[in-house]
């Protein structure tokens, strides 16, 4: 018993409509392939689904060649030169076809819409993905090596800087220790020791100057703390002057002022 005739109208059920589209699309693509193979015909088939997805078949090596041949076959021979807007429209169609083809390829790479693909097309897609993965891994490894090299260079720079800072710190610490030792030993309790070690100098520290008639004190040895002695002597002179001012009738030894 043969199949009954199918009423040619839009299928309202969405799932049934998609199933019917897939079956008839595959059949149409198969017929186009058989026609080109059996009859040596140049066949180009372009199908857009209800959701705008592109399905195409071309018996030639490139769909664009067939489309260009179709465009050149102008049915109106009297109008050989197409208007500019027609040329632009044809260019738009080419670009649109190219974009839709790339979108379909992208979906296939993402694992979508693989149903219409044949075994050979699936193998080609698999090989393409494997090649892409190899290139991605190679680039990733190279980026990691470059990053590791940069980190090692920065580490070496930081080590050199740390070495210089440590050296400067040691030099500064040595200078501070020497300075503190000098202050503790020579600035406070060590002044007498320094003077005792140099008797031929400190004997003239409090010796009166020979050119002066009075007995004013003179500093004959320039010690690092000589300004402390000078300040002390100035203090004594000021006290003597105050005593003369407050007690003018009392006798003050001449060596005090």
Curated annotation (Swiss-Prot):
Q: Which domain of life does the protein's organism represent?
A: Eukaryota
Summed up, the tissue specificity of this protein is: Expressed in lemmas, paleas and pistils. Weakly expressed in carpels.
Q: Which SUPFAM superfamilies match?
A: SRF-like
Instruction: List the keywords (alphabetical).
Output: Activator, Developmental protein, Differentiation, DNA-binding, Flowering, Nucleus, Transcription, Transcription regulation
For the MADS-box domain, which residue ranges apply?
Answer: 1-61
What are the recorded GO MF terms, alphabetically? DNA binding; DNA-binding transcription factor activity, RNA polymerase II-specific; protein dimerization activity; RNA polymerase II cis-regulatory region sequence-specific DNA binding; transcription factor binding
Can you give the residue ranges of the K-box domain?
Answer: 85-175
Q: Which InterPro entries match?
A: MADS-box/MEF2_TF, MEF2-like_N, TF_Kbox, TF_MADSbox, TF_MADSbox_sf
PROSITE patterns, alphabetically? K_BOX, MADS_BOX_1, MADS_BOX_2
Q: Which SMART domains match?
A: MADS
Loss of function: phenotype: Homeotic transformation of lodicules, stamens and carpels into lemma- and palea-like structures.
Any Gene Ontology CC annotation = nucleus
The protein's location, in the record's own words, is: Nucleus
Which GO terms fall under biological process for this protein?
cell differentiation; floral meristem determinacy; meristem determinacy; positive regulation of transcription by RNA polymerase II; regulation of meristem development; regulation of transcription by RNA polymerase II; specification of floral organ identity
Briefly state the protein's biological role.
Answer: Probable transcription factor involved in the development of floral organs. Required for the formation of inner floral organs (lodicules, stamens and carpels, or whorls 2, 3 and 4) and the lemma and palea (whorl 1), which are grass floral organs analogous to sepals. May be involved in the control of flowering time. Seems to act as transcriptional activator. May act upstream of the auxin-responsive protein GH3.8.
Q: How does it assemble?
A: May interact with the K-box of MADS6, MADS14 and MADS15.
Name of the protein in question:
MADS-box transcription factor 1
Lineage of producing organism:
Eukaryota, Viridiplantae, Streptophyta, Embryophyta, Tracheophyta
